[in-house]
Amino acid sequence: MQPESGANGTVIAEFILLGLLEAPGLQPVVFVLFLFAYLVTVGGNLSILAAVLVEPKLHSPMYFFLGNLSVLDVGCISVTVPSMLSRLLSRKRAVPCGACLTQLFFFHLFVGVDCFLLTAMAYDRFLAICRPLTYSTRMSQTVQRMLVAASWACAFTNALTHTVAMSTLNFCGPNEVNHFYCDLPQLFQLSCSSTQLNELLLFAVGFIMAGTPMALIVISYIHVAAAVLRIRSVEGRKKAFSTCGSHLTVVAMFYGSGIFNYMRLGSTKLSDKDKAVGIFNTVINPMVNPIIYRFRNPEVQSAIWRMLTGRRSLA
């Protein structure tokens, strides 16, 4: 990100994040709501992570991935919300260019890992339901760790690519970002150099990072649905759909908000709808994920309850 001298000769070395609302009287309300959402998200995801670590019944591939997903949700919301809360308290909206790039990198890192991890979870469900005889071999601990490591490596490459590409753009004014965190669409609109290459890169990498995993998820669940429909036991079908239903809900929310946010860069003006989608990406998704997995999964519910009450598992 290369700051340049603007028309008045000043050098742009920082961005002004306008936040969610301009009305000063509503800032305390925004602060309380987002602080509450942050605490609920961190508490909910850490409770699932703790349950996965200490509960023997949850020492399986599906819950291994769920524990990793909880870490990602905490990371995703921690990249954006604490800094926003700090600005609300200090009433200082200026963010240095370097800090903006750092936030951009880590946000896309966590979101990218999330993308691949959801695919790994779909593959796990496919093996468990469609290939039960070879499940333990194909989804061994080594395979699980390799899938997680590959997810981090691919996401790191993606985040670094966008961050480096963004750093090559020139910014000579204005420097007001109509958002509460630094992200690609908003920064593209402030650049005084061409962003065509950056947007093409976003679409190309986005197809690889989102399109391919989404296709793999759809294919996996087509096979899963066909296998579940062949199960004669009503209880067996119910159990299969309960574990898959939670994951499908999270996938729909994650990809739905992501596609809306990044696949409409041709818009000449970003509106408050983009802020709403930003809230969905950074706050709502990480907050509701543990709720979805907890309330739609009896094993997670009982594990968290035993952990809170100090009871030991019978396993």
Curated annotation (Swiss-Prot):
Main localization of the protein described in the UniProt heading: membrane
Parts of the chain on the Cytoplasmic side: 53-60, 124-143, 224-240, 296-315
GO molecular function (one): G protein-coupled receptor activity
Residues bearing glycans: 8
Subcellular localization: Cell membrane
Keyword flag Transmembrane helix: yes
SUPFAM superfamilies: Family A G protein-coupled receptor-like (SSF81321)
GO cellular component: plasma membrane
InterPro entries per record: GPCR_Rhodpsn, GPCR_Rhodpsn_7TM, Olfact_rcpt
Keyword entries, A-Z: Cell membrane, Disulfide bond, G-protein coupled receptor, Glycoprotein, Membrane, Olfaction, Receptor, Sensory transduction, Transducer, Transmembrane, Transmembrane helix
Topology within the bilayer: Multi-pass membrane protein
Disulfide bond annotation, renumbered to this chain: 100-192
Domain of life the protein comes from: Eukaryota
One Pfam family, short name: 7tm_4
Extracellular side: 1-28, 83-103, 162-199, 265-275
TM region(s), chain numbering: 29-52, 61-82, 104-123, 144-161, 200-223, 241-264, 276-295
Keyword Membrane attached: yes
PANTHER family noted in UniProt: OLFACTORY RECEPTOR
Function per UniProt: Odorant receptor.
Family: Belongs to the G-protein coupled receptor 1 family.
Protein name: Olfactory receptor 3A1
Organism for this UniProt entry: Pan troglodytes
Gene designation: OR3A1
